[in-house]
Curated annotation (Swiss-Prot):
It catalyses: L-methionyl-tRNA(fMet) + (6R)-10-formyltetrahydrofolate = N-formyl-L-methionyl-tRNA(fMet) + (6S)-5,6,7,8-tetrahydrofolate + H(+). (6S)-5,6,7,8-tetrahydrofolate binds at S117, L118, L119, P120. CDD domains: FMT_core_Met-tRNA-FMT_N, Met_tRNA_FMT_C. It is an enzyme of class 2 (transferase). One of its GO terms (cellular component) is cytosol. This is Methionyl-tRNA formyltransferase. Attaches a formyl group to the free amino group of methionyl-tRNA(fMet). The formyl group appears to play a dual role in the initiator identity of N-formylmethionyl-tRNA by promoting its recognition by IF2 and preventing the misappropriation of this tRNA by the elongation apparatus.
Amino acid sequence: MRLVFAGTPEFARIALDALLAAGHDVPLVLTQPDRPAGRGLKLTPSPVKQAALAAGIEVAQPRSLRLDGRYPDEAAAARAQLERVAPDVMVVAAYGLILPQWTLDLPRLGCLNIHASLLPRWRGAAPIQRAIEAGDAETGVTIMQMDAGLDTGDMLLERAVPIGAQQTAAQLHDELALAGGQAIVDALAALGQGGLAPRRQPDAGVTYAAKLDKAEAALDCSLPAAVLARRVRAFNPVPGATIRLPGLDDPVKVWRAQALEQAAGGPPGAVLRADAQGIDIATGQGVLRLLELQKAGGKRQPVDVFVRGWQP
């Protein structure tokens, strides 16, 4: 099947690799423009662009696909490239640009999206993090026929993935990326044989995964410890949960924490204990034990190392 692939981060790169390994013809890739990265803020290509160039695939990087937007010339050039390629399907995975109607209509079989949740739960920008934050027992990937709405299109295939009790967003991301790559390969194989029946998303159970905000990173110790522990996992590695500790001017990043089912024994935010076993923080309900931390400008440290250089 002749495909155009549109995606940007590592999640999408894994899907592109899976499509190429399955033997699909991918003559064109769309990805976001190169961005400054690292301490030197050097312009860096996306993981998808790097993979495409390594495979000898043509790459387009329009800043917008809207013909009536801020970059109409770039959108028109991308449209000309797509029309020349004449794809059967466009596969979209974490691309980062809104697809206007002309884009949805151009491929013979439309545009298929790899979404990192079991729709209609967690439509939107941050489904992996929000699933962990909410305490969901499972999530998954959905292959969806794209329409003009926000993750509202008909579902073609779903694959459920359990969420581990201590699993971080980074770990779940990697698992879902692999599941998504296999799911899109399976979906295209079934689609080519006429074996996929689109299913309308149910009206019940719709939730939205709002984009992550840096302000959310600061742990509010008036919340229950269980909620805070989930946020530590959900925000690992980005934006990274933080907490303020006495004696330190800057917030400390929390990489790993555990909720203890015991009485707080102090006002929210109070340090109840600090030793090699952990730093116990009183919360609105229960105790949050900090297990791995990082001072501003420092390195990640297990708590037994951290406490040797800090006293409350």
